Amino acid sequence: MEQRVIDTLRKVFELNGFIGIETRAVETGASLLKKGETSKEIYLLSRLQEVGHESDTPIEERLGLHFDLTVPLSRYVVEHSGALAFPFKRWQIQKVWRGERPQEGRFREFVQADIDVIGAGDLPDHYEVELPLVMVSALEELRAYGLPKATVHANNRKLSEGFYRGLGLTDVEGVLREIDKLDKIGADEVARLLTETCGATEAQARACLELAELTASDGAELAAKFDALCEAHGIVKDSEAYTLARQGLDTLAMIVDEAAAIRPGSVIADLKIARGLDYYTGSVYETFLDGAASLGSICSGGRYDNLASQGNRKYPGVGLSIGLSRLVSYMLHTAGAHANRVSPAAVLVAVWNEEDRPAANRIANQLRARGIATDVAPTAAKLGKQIKYADKLGIPYVWFPATAAESAEGAEPAGDEVKNIVTGEQVAADCTSWEPDTVVAQQTVEI
């Protein structure tokens, strides 16, 4: 199932012009720590002879396993900037490692699937619409395997920051981190944290929560609700705080309206979306599945303007990431998907005796040359055992070479036959022209 999901995502990403890359698994501590408060997630590496002496080396100089694919991307872009065409659109599907406590939906080692667009100097806002639509399109393809409909919930950091500053709050990053916990711990606990850790009054905390309650499906509705909230809390329209918030509001309204014109209902404005990591500077996204509230977000990301730079040149970007292993786990255990094939082969060529194996291999090679995935029985066991072997691997067809009929005492020479072991149908077949049923041959493979 995981491989089929990977293939589906890759197909959609490449249809939209994204280029696949792979980066090394190991990065320096300095690179890994660029993303903010992530030290607890990093697995550091040591040579055996260094065990017990790790403290002699600063964390920034040590090596660690990457915990996401954005930090390696920023290094890759800087190192290869002279050879890349910007904006650089990349997809990457690779394993990452995090210091998680293993539990359902949380893994220490898992596969992540990312798409990002990186600009040189600047990056047009329209990519902030394009990327969530690409992800929605990819997730829509996975509905064939039981995944529910996905909706992207978007916000903009500038909108939130301007509003918080308009209230008189100064610890904007702290407020964003606490608001990011809203779905996990609830409004009362977030309000308490805002007052205790961010210096907010009870009235300011309530206003922050009121902002987080705002949702809208179009730009006009969003602007009307936001302006009413600003007026209620005394944030005037000619203030610097409102001007900053309005920049974010205009971008968010553009995203929602343009997404609605292309794929209605795929993206909504949801002002509780905060994304706790410090490096996001504009749009932020979380993606939720219909009827799967307990699962939480399955795809997240946002705009970052300051993650990568080279001298005076900055490389702003926008990206989205799917925790693919977590998504596949949900599909297998909750969404009703199932992996009914272990082998990618569509055909198993039977072997009646070892003297006939060369003939079986020739048939297999002719089928493979025509693009039909084929395996050959490992031993010349009884026919029933060979069919059971194919069934255990989920191989839907068993090919009987002509030598089967010829080897039977008193039988006339006959042509090859192929049996669909799912339906029981058995027909004459020629390996130069026979085609498997595409539905049967392409059923889900790879657990």
Predicted regions and their residues:
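Internal, well-ordered alpha-helical segments in soluble enzyme and binding-protein domains
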Residues: L131, N156-L159, V175-E178, V190, ...
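Positively charged, Gly/Ser-enriched RNA/tRNA-binding surfaces
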Residues: R4-G17, E27-A30, T38, P58-E60, ...
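A cross-family signal for N-terminal binding/gating loops and helix N-caps
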Residues: G20-V51, D250
